[in-house]
């Protein structure tokens, strides 16, 4: 065997006649036999030929000029031997000699341990069951593919929103896949009334709202700079509104936007050439008009109630919204025969809390067509979801849903101050001329003058005005009026007198209007320039 290799390539003349690939194949064969034979054959090759092979096998652009011939041969043998060992181990684990290509249709992979299945998506790598056909966390439940850079606005998700009946499976799908699926209800030219504004989950069949997805398309279109994405988002919004009877005004606005773009390009936006799609939106003649229609559609959507599986048949009016309470007025339509007693059920919760276990329920009974009721003990500055169901016996007649945001405590305090100011002004008008007339507005102007002249500090001004409008008694207000009248020509003396007399009063704690927590922010809001 040694004599054969010696004859074939054992001298410099023989090796120089061989191509680079032939020399490389011979080196691989020799490394599988023995190190001695490997070195014996390569000893007669030139250093440049061996260095060339070493650079190719090590995949490093190093000249190796500082090594002797024996050192170069030894290093080449070690590298080639390791490669042979690694290839042999791979063959034992994976019998197939062909390299498997990445398959996005079924994104599963055996890795990180024998027999364990993991998602091929590097951003997910979810552990999967052996019988799984796709990754439920990151892949589409229709086409089984995933996106490398997932854009949530291009996906529909089966969520656990309690406005619709049924349990959510939590799966998601591409928006375009849903358009092509008959099970989703989005393929129909005219959707039925029970899923208008909604879509059906292809996996479990649960009804979900598509309004949030519609809003995302319009918002992105309004902010987009590239023509291609701009037109694509408006096209998706147009498809989501196809055949709707519930959102006619919104559909008309989007339709106008589509027509403007069609007139601009001369072709439907679904057939937009790639050359046109690379342009900038602000260079379009119709850009301003299209964005105006998108904004009008968004404004209309914000004013509409959430979609429901049952059409509303009650007239609900929100009479007042405070920090901790909301008052409703319900009027039943005349077309419904309510009987002797009207039965309502109201379910409400914070928008941030989607778990049904935290939903609060109240049963309401009324013998008249009008019912007024107040929901108490709410959290200030919080969005609440309300659902009011009307019954005839045990049968549900209608469902109405809406979101209400409670006011902040400061908003209530400001309203109380404005009411106090109005009362003071009315009382001042009724007083006789020549009598002392000193209302809240005069107090505000006076204290600001003292602050601007450096007689009082900003902190004292805030606390004093808050105390004066919310906590001061009539007697204390009368004392302030006397001081103002007495020291009206000496601002420095007036400031000292107010500080000495009322420093303790303004820091004394009193029960506040409405029983809320103490706040000194009212005067701040009223006095900001």
UniProtKB/Swiss-Prot annotation:
InterPro entries: FN3_dom, FN3_sf, Ig-like_fold, Oberon-like_PHD, VIN3-like, VIN3-like_C
Localization (cell): Nucleus
GO cellular component: nucleus
Induction (record text): By cold, especially after vernalization and transfer to warm temperatures (e.g. 40 days at 4 degrees Celsius followed by 14 days at 22 degrees Celsius).
UniProt record, GO biological process: cellular response to cold; epigenetic regulation of gene expression; response to cold; vernalization response
Transmembrane feature ranges: none
Keywords: Metal-binding, Nucleus, Transcription, Transcription regulation, Zinc, Zinc-finger
One Pfam family here: PHD_Oberon
Keyword Metal-binding among record annotations: yes
Gene3D superfamilies: Immunoglobulins
Residues in Fibronectin type-III domain copies: 312-411
Region (VIN3-Interacting Domain (VID)), start-end ranges: 421-529
Subcellular location, principal: nucleus
SUPFAM superfamilies in alphabetical order: Fibronectin type III
Motif (Nuclear localization signal): 97-104, 214-221
GO function term, MF aspect, one: zinc ion binding
Record bears the keyword Protein transport: no
ZnF endpoints (PHD-type): 137-207
Quaternary organization: Interacts with VIN3.
Function: Involved in both the vernalization and photoperiod pathways by regulating gene expression.
Protein's name in the database: VIN3-like protein 3
Provenance organism: Arabidopsis thaliana (Mouse-ear cress)
């Amino acid at each position: 065997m040694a004599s054969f290799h010696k004859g074939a390539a054992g001298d410099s003349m023989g090796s120089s006649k061989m191509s680079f690939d032939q020399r490389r194949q011979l080196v691989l064969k020799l490394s599988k036999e023995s190190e001695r034979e490997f070195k014996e054959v390569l000893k007669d090759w030139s250093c440049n030929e061996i260095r060339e092979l070493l650079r190719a096998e090590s995949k490093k652009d190093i000249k190796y000029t500082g090594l002797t011939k024996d050192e170069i041969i030894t290093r080449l043998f070690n590298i080639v031997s390791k490669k042979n060992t690694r290839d042999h181990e791979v063959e034992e684990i994976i019998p197939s000699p062909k390299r498997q290509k990445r398959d996005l249709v079924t994104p599963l992979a055996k890795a990180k341990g024998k027999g364990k299945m993991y998602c091929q998506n590097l951003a997910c790598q979810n552990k999967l069951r052996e019988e799984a056909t796709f990754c439920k966390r990151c892949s589409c439940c229709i086409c089984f593919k995933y996106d490398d850079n997932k854009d949530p606005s291009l996906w529909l998700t089966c969520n656990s929103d309690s406005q619709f009946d049924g349990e959510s499976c939590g799966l998601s799908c591409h928006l375009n896949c849903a358009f092509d699926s008959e099970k989703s209800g989005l393929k129909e030219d005219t959707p039925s009334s029970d899923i208008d504004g909604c879509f059906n989950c292809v996996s479990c069949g649960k009804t979900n709202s598509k309004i949030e997805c519609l809003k995302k398309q319009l918002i992105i279109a309004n902010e987009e700079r590239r023509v291609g994405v701009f037109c694509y988002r408006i096209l998706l919004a147009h498809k989501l509104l196809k055949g709707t009877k519930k959102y006619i005004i919104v559909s008309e606005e989007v339709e106008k936007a589509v027509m403007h773009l069609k007139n601009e390009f001369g072709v439907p936006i679904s057939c937009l050439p790639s050359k046109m799609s690379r342009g900038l939106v602000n260079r379009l003649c119709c850009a301003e008009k299209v964005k105006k229609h998108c904004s009008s559609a968004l404004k209309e959507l914000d004013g509409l109630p959430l979609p429901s599986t049952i059409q509303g048949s009650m007239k609900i009016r929100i009479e007042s919204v405070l920090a901790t309470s909301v008052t409703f007025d319900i009027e039943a339509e005349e077309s419904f025969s309510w009987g002797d007693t009207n039965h309502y059920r109201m379910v409400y919760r914070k928008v941030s809390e989607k778990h049904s276990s935290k939903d609060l329920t109240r049963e309401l009974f009324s013998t008249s067509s009008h019912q007024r009721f107040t929901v108490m003990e709410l959290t200030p500055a919080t969005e609440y979801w309300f659902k009011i169901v009307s019954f005839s016996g045990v049968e549900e007649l209608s469902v109405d849903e809406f979101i209400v945001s409670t006011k902040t405590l400061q908003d209530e305090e400001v309203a109380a101050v404005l009411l106090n100011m109005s009362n003071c002004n009315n009382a001042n008008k009724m007083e006789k001329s020549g009598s002392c007339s000193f209302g809240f507005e005069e107090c505000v102007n006076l204290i600001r003058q003292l602050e601007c002249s450096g007689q009082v500090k900003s902190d004292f001004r805030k606390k004093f005005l808050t105390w004066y409008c919310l906590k001061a008694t009539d007697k204390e207000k009368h004392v302030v009026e006397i001081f103002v009248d007495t020291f009206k020509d000496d601002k420095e003396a007036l400031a000292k007198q107010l500080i000495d007399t009322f420093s303790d009063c303004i820091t004394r704690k009193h029960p506040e209007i409405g029983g809320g927590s103490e706040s000194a922010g009212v005067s701040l809001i009223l006095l900001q320039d």
